């Protein structure tokens, strides 16, 4: 029962708020530290959290780039590292040359997508598991945390590019939590499916697909605000009486 509660509470944590959730879990007496550590690891892997391994280098963590002994690696930077899941700090950073080298042409195009189309803090990773198949897992993550204004959010693009099949397939995910005078959650995703005739067109295709997904989210959010949220607002009563606005400043609520 305790492990299930820990799983659900951590799993449903909004972007940028999981540490506060863990703090609250301990405050209410859930003290299975092994379960907390395991769920923290899975949370950061599943939502592709990023960590800094140097002053100017950030990497993504996932189940796909995990090594034995609780280590992870970045195929582009050719580095491996461990992680403190509570502080989200990379530790024991080492060179790692055993992974397959990612072609420069692909790295340059994904870097360009990140720099041209992501306004907030963005990190990317590219993973290739086999020399036999020209297939690359591409992960782009952009997060923006603004707790002073009561909102946090993240955008993730996870797709697979198969060179021989000329296919780009995956999903883009958006998760936003707004909690000023309420508690509004947005957790949605859209499929990615496109043809990439040649590797040199990867930037163009991925940028076009992501722009289309963003526009579809914008349309849906506009509709949500104009229709669904309006239905939730309390309708003021119609009294059909005129108000003497000059005397409004002198009105006081009667004690009840």
Swiss-Prot record:
Regions annotated as coiled coil: none
Keyword Phosphoprotein: yes
Residues where Phosphoserine is found: 31
Main location: cytoplasm
Subcellular location: Cytoplasm; Cytoplasm, Cytoskeleton, Actin patch; Cytoplasm, Cytoskeleton
Family matches, as PROSITE patterns: F_ACTIN_CAPPING_A_1, F_ACTIN_CAPPING_A_2
Keywords from the UniProt entry: Actin capping, Actin-binding, Cytoplasm, Cytoskeleton, Phosphoprotein
SUPFAM superfamilies xrefs: Subunits of heterodimeric actin filament capping protein Capz
GO molecular function: actin filament binding
Gene Ontology CC: actin cortical patch; cell division site; cell tip; cortical cytoskeleton; F-actin capping protein complex
Pfam families to which the protein is assigned, alphabetical: F-actin_cap_A
Gene Ontology BP annotations: actin cortical patch organization; actin cytoskeleton organization; barbed-end actin filament capping; mating projection actin fusion focus assembly; mitotic actomyosin contractile ring assembly; mitotic actomyosin contractile ring contraction
Subunit record text: Component of the F-actin capping complex, composed of a heterodimer of an alpha and a beta subunit.
Recorded family membership: Belongs to the F-actin-capping protein alpha subunit family.
Known role: F-actin-capping proteins bind in a Ca(2+)-independent manner to the fast growing ends of actin filaments (barbed end) thereby blocking the exchange of subunits at these ends. Unlike other capping proteins (such as gelsolin and severin), these proteins do not sever actin filaments. Competes with formin cdc12 for attachment to the actin filaments barbed ends. Slowly replaces cdc12 on the barbed ends in preparation for filament disassembly during contractile ring constriction.
Protein name, per record: F-actin-capping protein subunit alpha
Species the sequence originates in: Schizosaccharomyces pombe (strain 972 / ATCC 24843) (Fission yeast)
């Amino acid at each position: 029962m305790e492990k299930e509660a820990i799983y659900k509470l951590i799993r449903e944590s909004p972007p940028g708020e999981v540490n506060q959730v863990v703090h609250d879990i301990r405050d209410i007496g859930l003290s299975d530290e092994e379960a907390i550590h395991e769920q923290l690891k899975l949370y950061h892997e599943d939502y592709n959290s990023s960590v800094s391994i140097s002053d100017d280098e950030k990497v993504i963590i996932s189940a796909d780039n995990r090594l034995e002994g609780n280590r992870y690696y970045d195929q582009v930077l050719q580095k491996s590292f461990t992680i403190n899941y509570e502080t989200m700090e990379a530790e024991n950073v080492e060179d790692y040359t055993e992974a397959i080298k990612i072609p420069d042409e692909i790295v340059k195009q994904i870097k360009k997508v990140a720099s041209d189309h992501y306004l907030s803090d963005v990190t990317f990773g590219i993973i290739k598991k086999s020399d036999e198949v020209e297939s690359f897992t591409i992960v782009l993550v952009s997060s923006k945390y603004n707790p002073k204004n009561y909102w946090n959010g993240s955008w993730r693009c996870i797709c697979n590019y198969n060179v021989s099949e000329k296919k780009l397939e995956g999903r883009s995910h958006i998760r936003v939590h707004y909690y000023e005078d309420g508690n509004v959650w947005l957790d949605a995703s859209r499929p990615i499916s496109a043809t990439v005739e040649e590797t040199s067109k990867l930037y163009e295709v991925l940028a076009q697909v992501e722009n289309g997904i963003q526009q579809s989210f914008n349309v849906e959010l506009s509709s949500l605000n104009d229709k669904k949220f309006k239905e939730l607002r309390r309708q003021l009563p119609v009294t059909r009486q005129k108000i003497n606005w000059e005397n409004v400043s002198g009105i006081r609520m009667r004690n009840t």
